[in-house]
Amino acid sequence: MFTIKNFDELTNTELYAICAQRVAVFVVEQNCPYQDIDGLDPRCQHMFVMNNGEIDAYLRVFDRGTVDDHHSPRREGVASLGRIITGPKARGKGMGHQLVAAGIEHVRTTMPHVHTIFISAQEHLAETYYGKHGFERVSEVYLEDDIPHVDMELKL
Amino acid sequence: MFTAKKFSDLTVEELNAIYIARSKVFTVGQQLTVQEPDLADRQAVHFFSQNDAGEVVAYMRLIDLEKIEDDHYEQVSGAYALSRVAVLKTLRGQGMGRKLLDAAIQWVRDETEATKIIIDAQAYLRDSYYAPVGFVQVGEEFREAGLPHVKMILEL
């Protein structure tokens, strides 16, 4: 159901659709003018479902052992899931949970050295959404771009 | 110095670099929570300059108003529009914006049959940036994305 691609395998139409939907959700809908297109995407794998040229569900995965970014310092054996969204038209159908489950499964099956999956979750989703997949809080609540977040980890 | 490419001719790296630059200048720089990127990208010519690291440092998109099919652009025969005109903050004050505008106008002269260029300019740039190369204001100031704008036309 979900397509997963390395950055250089994305078509321009796919990258457009991904960036447009991420901005639609994180910048426009949440009224948060931050730099969503942050430069990390070339080092991520991108998991998504597209429907009529629009992204219904999306996340990006990266190996923290190979990435060193000011938001995501290097951590061996850790993979991050980020920018997790379902598009407005795709909500209420359980697709978000399928997406997170598929993301976890992708890490389990393709990154054998990874023992922990990390997310920086919007706090209101911590238990209702990520907790259902086994993620546990590992930090206090903090503000990122004025939105309460909490770090969560899933031990594989 | 400047590259002009249709959407489908861009590499995915170039498209990503364009979106990073636009995100920095408009979303973060001007604290705008509008939809960025938008669908017009797929019908535009992307006009940009990159530094040695591949970062897009100056950018605009050129839209053939005779052919455009998009909710945000009215069709006008014989006209091109310039939009999303952006120079990275680190490059400002060095004449880069002027070179970008001159080169884009020259591109429209050389590569198209258009007889005029239309821009919805941010009002603060009317006299300092667009008027000196011949753009003339038409109509009253209006607000778009919460910012004062003016429509300006350059007859070629």
Please name every model-derived segment:
Chain B
Residues 1-55:
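Short amphipathic alpha-helix that is part of the acyltransferase structural core
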Residues 108-123:
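Conserved GNAT acetyl-CoA-binding A-motif
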Residues 151-155:
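Short C-terminal beta-strand
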Residues 32-34, 44-48, 59, 84, ...:
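Short hydrophobic/aromatic beta-strand element in the GNAT-like acyltransferase core
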Residues 123-140, 145-146:
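Conserved active-site alpha-helix within GNAT-family acetyltransferase domains
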Residues 87, 93-106:
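Conserved acetyl-CoA-binding loop-helix of GNAT-fold acetyltransferases
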Residues 65-82, 92, 111-115:
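A conserved beta-turn-beta hairpin within the catalytic core of GNAT-like acetyltransferases
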